[in-house]
């Protein structure tokens, strides 16, 4: 039985032959590329030029104009913003910073309104009545984010600290992003959001004609959906979705 990437390689080689080298092939991760190269090498009758390989982060970086920052540097930059509001040594902040960075990443990838999200936790009912413009996907991200901090009877020390600084998180989020923007670096979600906003504003175009293959994606973030719609309409693009047959054939799912 052929793997998904073997099937993609076989179909592309059948359609393009050695012209497959003219394609830009976009994978979710770099690891998928190695399996695809192995599958393609078994199909080719002689040595051939490889396609151009990209990950989603590579293309988001090109569109956004930002560069991916190393995680330790990102946390250090976050601490500089956070420490302006709260007196806490870096060694105690580090775990907290990891969690905040992950949360900021999710907020941006799903294009969540951070100002709505960071309202006072005790005004949850107000938030619930002010979500008519949000998609079900965005609502679910918000609910998952808030679920960790709403059970006052079982709060851990980390959660208590979160509640104590809740009112400042909006300022920390915006200040952190502005600081990174000035340095031309970003975390993954910030880079994706910047790319999506640039595409939606019509402020980006490829300098040359390109043919893309998007392979191996399934559940997409809001920013990825914007990018793929752009590729669909502004480049010759083939999509190979990696969905489980169970969900495709079972209409109740």
Report each predicted region and the residues it spans.
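Conserved RecA-like ASCE P-loop NTPase motor core of nucleic-acid helicases/translocases
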Residues: 19-32, 212
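N- or domain-start disorder-to-order transition segments that initiate the globular core
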Residues: 1-12
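Short glycine-/polar-rich loops that comprise or flank the Walker A/P-loop
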Residues: 20-23, 47-51, 208-210, 234-237
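Structural beta-sheet core signal
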Residues: 25, 214, 239-241
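Basic/charged alpha-beta structural segments of nucleotide/phosphate-handling enzymes
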Residues: 30-206, 222, 244, 249
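Conserved RecA-like helicase ATPase core segment
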Residues: 210, 222-253
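Conserved P-loop NTPase "ATPase switch" module shared by AAA+ and STAND
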Residues: 208-220
